[in-house]
């Protein structure tokens, strides 16, 4: 989403500074988002999150192009994202060991899926 935001700004004639603002805005909006795919498949809830992130990218690009800057620079938001990612437990890092992947509905569906 951050790369898409930066690319959108660049394609629409924005400055490198505006690209950085768009990137930072997206990172601040999705900071801490976990990866909890049901049954370990990158489908639920990932597809909907990808759609939401696409909207985040376009919104961030529009904000940056409108002159709305990020108080925290892009490089620092990237560092913060890394720090948060390092702090997350393994269960929330695409392992299907936490979050939505461990709801009763998700576990029941995974059991049926892998029984095939």
What are these regions (language model features)?
Residues 1:
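Glycine-rich phosphate/ribose-binding loops and adjacent secondary-structure elements
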Residues 6-116:
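Functionally critical mobile loop/hinge segments
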């Amino acid at each position: 989403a951050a790369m898409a935001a930066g690319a959108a700004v660049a394609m629409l004639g924005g400055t490198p500074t505006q690209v950085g603002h768009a990137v930072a805005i997206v990172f601040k909006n999705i900071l801490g988002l976990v990866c909890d795919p049901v049954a370990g498949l990158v489908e639920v809830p990932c597809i909907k999150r990808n759609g939401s992130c696409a909207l985040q990218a376009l919104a961030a690009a529009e904000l940056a192009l409108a002159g709305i800057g990020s108080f925290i620079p892009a490089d620092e938001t990237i560092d913060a994202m890394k720090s948060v990612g390092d702090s997350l437990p393994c269960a929330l890092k695409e392992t299907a060991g936490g979050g939505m992947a461990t709801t009763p509905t998700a576990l029941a569906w995974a059991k049926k899926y892998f029984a095939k």
